[in-house]
Amino acid sequence: MERIIRAPRGTTLSCKSWQTEAPMRMLMNNLDPEVARDPANLIVYGGTGRAARNWQCFDKIVETLKTLEMDETLLVQSGKPVAVFKTSEWAPRVLIANSNLVPKWANWEYFRELEERGLIMYGQMTAGSWIYIGTQGILQGTYETFYAVAKKYFGGTLKGKWVLTAGLGEMGGAQPLAVTLNDGVVLAVEIDKRMIERRLNTGYLDTWTDNLDEALEMVQKAVKEERPLSVALLANAADVHPELVKRGIIPDIVTDQTAAHDPLTGYVPAGMSFEEALKLRKENPQKYLELVYESVVKHINAILEMQKQGAKVFEYGNNIRRLAYDHGVKDAFNIPGYVPEYIRDLFAEGKGPFRWAALSGNPEDIYKTDKKVLELFPYDDHLRKWIELAQKKVKWQGLPARICWLGQGERAEFGLAINEMVKKGELEAPIVIGRDHHDTGSVASPYRETEAMKDGSDAIADWPILNAMLNVASGATWVSFHHGGGVGIGYSLHAGMVIVADGTDLAHKKLERVLTNDVGLGVVRHADAGYEIAIETAKKHNLRMPMLD
């Protein structure tokens, strides 16, 4: 019988404090059927990104958290609880390391050998670090990206423009709503009907069809009427994109969010159904991969042709360019990455995906914090628009949560305000505050977050390690360090942190340090690389950088 996991709600504790109750609830929330892509196999999102190595490990993590003291720390090695040590009340309650390999051995083939032997787990970014909040977790980032495209090329709106993309998984599933929130039209190609149904059920997608002509008719009608619309097409991008080129149908914008970072489990070859692909993947993985590589080449060549014919194209951080390049598409990197093209300046001033979740399970706690963030930053019209859109459009998945992009100084101010609300009893229960690893100073990923750095420091991985250590030193509740998130094994290293606002004076001190230092290092990382906006931000917030003194 399949296990159904959901986080407890309310104020009754299963653990000895909220500092240990929080990681337990968020681990469980990652596996809520409303949240996780494949909870029966502990897979949360992003190909095979897991919350725990196996069910035995999951049970033992929960059991250990229930008995953990306020001066003890649980160590988790790739989803397996390996030790509890006496530390201090300032130390994190949980330290997590997922998927990390010595660089020479950091490739999918060797990783899978270790995974088969039960020695390692792919944690993606927020799957194995227990702070995934459903598709909303990437929604604002996707919204911001398409807004940046609109601002750069189309006068600040996507009205009357259409986007072609593929992949409606837990990350890509944000694309339809992000485009329509920017008043555009999107055709999203997806081969797995379950993913289309999931996006329809969560309100991220308007409609679907399995007929290309019908899909194009809907798209073209909406474009003509300047009416926002999202259409999913049950098909394969490697079949559809070349066909569009052949017909001379060129979108305004083209991107991709298939899970191409993991070609074996995240990409389906052209010319076959999803069910046929699953069968071949299991019976002959080598043949499967050969067909994937052929399909990726067709897929990227079609996007390159669309680019030549005027489409604005970008890779959305799934490493599909590298995959195509390795299999013969030598101009694959003519497609720019989305971070240097649209997001870098936000990162340079410390803005990134700040998120929080209501441990009570009560949506009112989130609505009250929504109100608070707007009170604190009344000058930010873009933030107000986002919160209002999110309240109208975003359905809860698991524990109620919110995401918004806040910068240096803002995160700490808001975190302290939340803690005060908990202290005064304005919220039913404590709030957990975290972020995606995809943030300003917590990732080294030369094909995504750190692509085309001004000083050429794309592959320098000291920064995410410093980020993890700094968050430990500052008092985060749990801290994680992962390998391979977003772009796949061998291509990224990244750190995450989560902190609990439980209304105590100790939490106040920790929040002030963690939410200042975590993002502060991101500003420092970009200032060190020579970005003027980061240097100005560092000076404005009195960040001490000896080499700039």
From Swiss-Prot:
This protein's UniProt keywords: Cytoplasm, Histidine metabolism, Lyase, NAD
Note on how the cofactor is bound: Binds 1 NAD(+) per subunit.
Top-level lineage group: Bacteria
GO molecular function: urocanate hydratase activity
Keyword Secreted: no
Class of enzymatic activity (EC top level): lyase
Main location: cytoplasm
A GO cellular-component term linked to this record: cytoplasm
Enzyme Commission number(s) of this protein: 4.2.1.49
Pfam family, any one: Urocanase
GO BP terms: L-histidine catabolic process to glutamate and formamide; L-histidine catabolic process to glutamate and formate
Keyword NAD tagged: yes
Residues binding NAD(+): 46-47, 124, 190, 236-237, 257-261, 267-268, 316, 486
PROSITE patterns: UROCANASE
Active site, renumbered: C404
Pathway where it operates: Amino-acid degradation; L-histidine degradation into L-glutamate; N-formimidoyl-L-glutamate from L-histidine: step 2/3
Cofactor(s) demanded: NAD(+)
Subcellular location: Cytoplasm
Catalytic function, reaction form: 4-imidazolone-5-propanoate = trans-urocanate + H2O
Described function: Catalyzes the conversion of urocanate to 4-imidazolone-5-propionate.
HAMAP family reported in the protein's UniProt record: HutU (MF_00577)
Similarity comment: family membership: Belongs to the urocanase family.
Protein's name in the database: Urocanate hydratase
Organism, scientific name: Thermosipho africanus (strain TCF52B)
Gene coding for it: hutU
